[in-house]
């Protein structure tokens, strides 16, 4: 476990190395997250002219969930949180967010970006292992940009169906899958 600002990173199920990475650009993104205020991200995006930095740091990606019926009463499980492009808006909308991410570096980027949020916990590790230790049910579970990769991290002959069955166990009775 480690703390970055108000964010707790639970590395209990982290295998010790990142099994997914975009390479050296992630070092640059971690530096940005550590040293550049969020209010300056658009300036950095314009200066760097990098697709990866635009993709991971643009607040435009928040639009994907801003109109969703998520309230301050909701508990959210974000599967595949990446560098936190959506984690922040989920935290502003919901009571709490448990973010699951396979990569420690991406989890660190996420934590530094949102270190002032007091309602985010990041769990680092393969979802199939992490989910066995989730202690609550969620009102909202997000699969934004990760469902199509289920065959890479769900050990099953039918990984997509298995993934949905696993997720279903963690939804409240009236829970929503996004």
Language-model-derived ranges and their functions:
Residues 55-73:
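Conserved alpha-helix/loop element of class I SAM-dependent methyltransferases that forms part
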Residues 132-141:
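A short acidic, Gly/Pro-enriched loop at the edge of an enzyme's catalytic core
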Residues 83-94:
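Conserved SAM-binding loop of SAM-dependent methyltransferases across substrates and taxa
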Residues 158-176:
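A short glycine-rich, Lys/Arg-flanked "PGG" loop and its adjoining helix->strand segment in the class I
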Residues 140-157:
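A short SAM/SAH-binding and catalytic strip from SAM-dependent methyltransferases
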Residues 93-129:
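Class I SAM-dependent methyltransferase SAM/SAH-binding core
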Residues 1-35:
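N-terminal auxiliary segments of SAM/dcSAM-dependent transferases
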Residues 73-82:
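Conserved class I S-adenosyl-L-methionine
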């Amino acid at each position: 476990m480690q703390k970055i600002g108000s964010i707790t990173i639970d590395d209990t199920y982290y295998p010790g190395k990142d099994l997914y990475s975009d390479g050296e650009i992630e070092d640059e993104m971690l530096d940005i997250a550590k040293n550049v205020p969020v209010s300056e991200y658009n300036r950095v995006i314009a200066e760097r002219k990098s697709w990866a930095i635009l993709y991971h740091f643009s607040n435009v990606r928040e639009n994907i969930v801003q109109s969703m019926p998520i309230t301050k009463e909701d508990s959210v499980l974000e599967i595949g949180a990446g560098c936190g492009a959506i984690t922040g808006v989920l935290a502003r909308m919901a009571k709490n967010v448990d973010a699951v991410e396979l990569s420690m570096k991406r989890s660190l980027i996420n934590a530094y970006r949102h270190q002032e949020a007091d309602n985010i916990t990041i769990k680092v590790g393969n979802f199939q292992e992490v989910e066995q230790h989730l202690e609550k049910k969620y009102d909202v579970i997000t699969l934004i940009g990760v469902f199509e990769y289920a065959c890479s991290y769900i050990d099953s002959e039918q990984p997509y169906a298995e993934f949905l069955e696993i997720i279903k166990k963690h939804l409240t009775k009236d829970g929503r899958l996004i």
